[in-house]
């Protein structure tokens, strides 16, 4: 009986050890998952940088009028925005290559910056991306905010332009809603949405037309669109807005990934806010096969963007 009791006690002890190890392992897995979510998925918020300068400081700094080119959900500019920047800055205009800025989304949007802005470069192109791919508009909002704050801290920036491609356009709109009237930051002059994603691919309803969408907004509304609809009036009314959309195949009201009911879903909001708003649609020429993922390489899109940003500089 005594030996049997000892065996039973050992069995209980082994069970207790095994159960303890199991609990520790579960806690560890949950901890890693929580850390991953915080560093990879959570928008977080960058530290606020309040920039105040004297007139003497402003006079001594290089004055620039930058244009931010914000990438899409891949995060990296090299597959899309870099082609657009290269094409635009190679044309006969005032634009020149400037900086490539990558925001570390899990590190309070610390910026990794390459390139330089030379003394004679008044209209630098700034490519903006993130260290991890995302279609979260809030993450892009903070990446843009950190970039603008960096530029304002190191240069005299009377104003800037901004282009957002795909998900980056939704992020740019969210940034403009929340920060375009922030007196600590320079004002935005023009906003271009290149095949911008605002309404999570929501399509027209059976009885709905694009004309009714332009007049009244979409009937199918995503959570992102609901945010824009609730907050659009916070955006600076002086910003000139350009919404661009590819049509492929011709007459499909589709860019290969996103329907026009998404790309133009916010047109009505800009109109109601009093922003001068223009729509630009384009199609493939014979022999061309551009779609949403390659639109930054399309000559027609590049030419229009150059005209918008640099025709009067």
Where in this protein do the model-derived segments appear?
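Generic detector of short alpha-helix boundary/capping microenvironments
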Residues: 16-19, 181
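Lipid deacylating catalytic domains
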Residues: 34-38, 44-163, 170-313
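N-terminal Lys/Arg-rich, disordered targeting/topogenic segments
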Residues: 1-14
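Hydrophobic membrane-insertion alpha-helices, especially the h-region
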Residues: 18-31
């Amino acid at each position: 009986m005594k030996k049997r009791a000892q065996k039973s006690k050992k069995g209980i002890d082994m069970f207790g050890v095994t159960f303890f190890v199991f609990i520790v392992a579960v806690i560890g897995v949950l901890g890693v998952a929580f850390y991953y979510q915080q560093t990879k998925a959570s928008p977080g918020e960058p530290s606020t940088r309040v920039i105040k300068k004297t007139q003497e400081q402003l006079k001594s700094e290089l004055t620039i009028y930058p244009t931010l080119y914000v990438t899409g959900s891949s995060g990296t500019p090299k597959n899309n925005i870099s082609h657009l920047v290269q094409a635009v800055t190679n044309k006969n205009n005032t634009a020149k290559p400037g900086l490539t800025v990558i925001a570390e989304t899990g590190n309070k949007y610390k910026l990794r910056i390459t390139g330089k802005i030379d003394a004679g470069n008044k209209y630098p192109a700034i490519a903006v991306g993130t260290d991890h791919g995302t279609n979260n508009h809030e993450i892009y909002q903070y990446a843009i905010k950190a970039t603008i704050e960096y530029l304002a801290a190191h240069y005299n920036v009377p104003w800037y332009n901004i282009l957002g491609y795909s998900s980056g356009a939704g992020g740019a709109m969210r940034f403009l809603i929340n920060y375009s009237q922030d007196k600590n930051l320079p004002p935005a002059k023009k906003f271009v949405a290149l095949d911008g994603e605002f309404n999570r691919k929501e399509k027209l309803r059976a009885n709905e037309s694009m004309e009714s969408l332009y007049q009244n907004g979409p009937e199918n509304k995503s959570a992102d669109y609901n945010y824009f609809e609730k907050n659009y009036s916070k955006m600076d009314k002086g910003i000139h807005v350009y919404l661009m959309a590819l049509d492929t195949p011709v007459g499909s009201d589709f860019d290969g990934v996103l329907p026009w009911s998404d790309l133009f879903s916010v047109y009505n909001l800009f109109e109601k806010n009093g922003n001068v708003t223009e729509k630009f649609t384009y199609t493939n020429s014979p022999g061309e096969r551009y779609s949403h993922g390659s639109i930054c390489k399309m000559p027609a899109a590049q030419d229009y963007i150059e005209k918008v940003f640099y025709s009067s500089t």
